[in-house]
From Swiss-Prot:
GO terms for molecular function: DNA binding; transposase activity. It comes from Sinorhizobium fredii (strain NBRC 101917 / NGR234). GO terms for biological process: DNA transposition. This is Putative transposase y4qE. The lineage of its organism: Bacteria, Pseudomonadati, Pseudomonadota, Alphaproteobacteria, Hyphomicrobiales. Belongs to the transposase IS1111A/IS1328/IS1533 family. It holds the Pfam family Transposase_20. The keyword Secreted does not apply. The keyword Aminoacyl-tRNA synthetase does not apply. Keywords: DNA recombination, DNA-binding, Plasmid, Transposable element, Transposition.
Length: 390
């Protein structure tokens, strides 16, 4: 059996560099001469267009540049059909690279032989410093005919998918490690030492968010690095689904969603939204004596981090309800029930902001009132997300 999988009833000559496999080559006068009915095709692959060259069989066979075709299945099929119509046996090759093995599988599915070449093992002239798609395709075709190319092992689709998954995880871990090192170096440079024992826990991330610098540039740099680390950390967290669902709300970004999830925890421990509002200190206070009842400002009891963050989020509801492009992508990642709650929250809170502003209320009072109701919608979405994933 030849390297290309076809039986040829004639003498054999082993290809050099093709793993010791025999190729359909005639031995004539002590020289290797291919069958004249064969052709060897070199393809220089690229993102948009592939350059193709054809080497006819025989020591003196013509090696010509065939042209460029679109790097699509339809374009490749047309080119292969035109080339194979003139020869009995056609062999294809291209360099391994970022385009993967899709072209290899396409050529094999059409009934032709193909090898994926190891780029580091392609023979090159020491003084040849001109590299173009045309020259590379011609060189591949000529070397394939001469048997000077080394093929790489091509995995099947299942094996490739698993390998890509493992590589993606490894890359994500390396990226996360790099970002953590950058944050640690930044904090050490400015003399900020974490007092706890274990770093990179949720308590450590909260500590990072509480750090303040005198210079705005330092503050912005820290925030950017912390957000990057949190974005890498969240997908592996038990509350990842809750964070993703909360980001469907208008004004709630990554930091707001993560802060709410870390500080509140399981929203199911609150029997009603009003209990959560009280926990966050967003409900009005009261001073009553005898028959006199007096309402005062919010209690400001409980968790101040989430309360402050919700008031900041409430500012976005001063605009009319709409869904931006970035938020539209977020909505595609959540369930239909979460999308309904998010849209209901947007229509109600924008209307409430306008109504309170029309009554002459101060902007701080308006935002606090909107933040109180926003907490109720976040409670509903968090419970819905936990029920969906459980």
């Amino acid at each position: 059996m030849s390297f290309f999988g076809s039986e040829v009833a004639r003498p054999r000559l082993f290809f050099r560099g093709l793993l010791g496999q025999a190729g359909p080559i005639l031995i004539t006068g002590g020289r290797a001469v291919a069958d004249y009915r064969e052709a060897f095709v070199g393809i220089d692959v690229a993102k948009l267009k592939n350059a193709i060259a054809v080497a006819e069989s025989g020591r003196n066979g013509e090696v010509r540049y065939w042209g460029e075709v679109e790097a699509s299945d339809a374009g490749i099929r047309r080119a292969i059909k035109q080339i194979t119509a003139k020869f009995e046996h056609v062999y294809f090759c291209y360099e391994a690279g970022p385009t993967g093995y899709g072209l290899y599988r396409l050529i094999r599915s059409l009934g032709h032989e193909c090898i994926v070449v190891a780029p580091s093992l392609i023979p090159r002239k020491p003084g040849d410093r001109v590299k173009t798609n045309r020259r590379d395709a011609i060189s591949l075709a000529r070397l394939l005919r001469a048997g000077e190319l080394t093929a790489v092992w091509v995995p099947d689709e299942d094996h490739e998918a698993m390998r890509d998954l493992v590589r993606a995880r490894t890359s994500a871990v390396e990226t996360l490690r790099t970002h953590r090192q950058q944050v640690n170096a930044f904090m050490l440079k400015h003399g900020r030492i974490y007092p706890g024992k274990r770093s990179w826990t949720m308590r450590y991330l909260r500590w990072l968010q509480e750090q303040h610098f005198d210079h705005p540039a330092h503050q912005i740099a820290l925030q950017e690095m912390v957000e990057t680390v949190i974005a890498e950390f969240v997908p592996h967290w038990s509350l990842a689904a809750v964070v993703c669902a909360l980001r469907a709300l208008r004004g709630v970004d990554l930091i707001a969603a993560v802060t709410f999830a870390t500080e509140v925890g399981d929203a199911g421990r609150f029997e009603s939204p009003r209990q959560l509002m009280g926990y966050l200190g967003l409900v009005p206070g009261e001073r009553s004596t005898g028959e006199t009842t007096k309402r005062i400002g919010i209690t400001k009891a409980g968790n101040s981090r989430v309360r402050t963050l919700l008031v900041e989020c409430a500012w976005t509801y001063r605009y009319p309800p709409r869904i931006g492009k970035r938020k539209l992508y977020r909505l595609e990642e959540v369930s239909s029930s979460v999308r309904e709650i998010a849209w209901k929250a947007q229509t109600r809170l924008t209307a409430r902001y306008r109504m309170l502003s029309a009554r002459g209320k101060k902007s701080t009072v308006v935002c606090t009132a909107v933040a109180r109701e926003l907490a109720g919608f976040m409670w509903a979405i968090a419970r819905e997300a936990r029920q969906t994933t459980s």
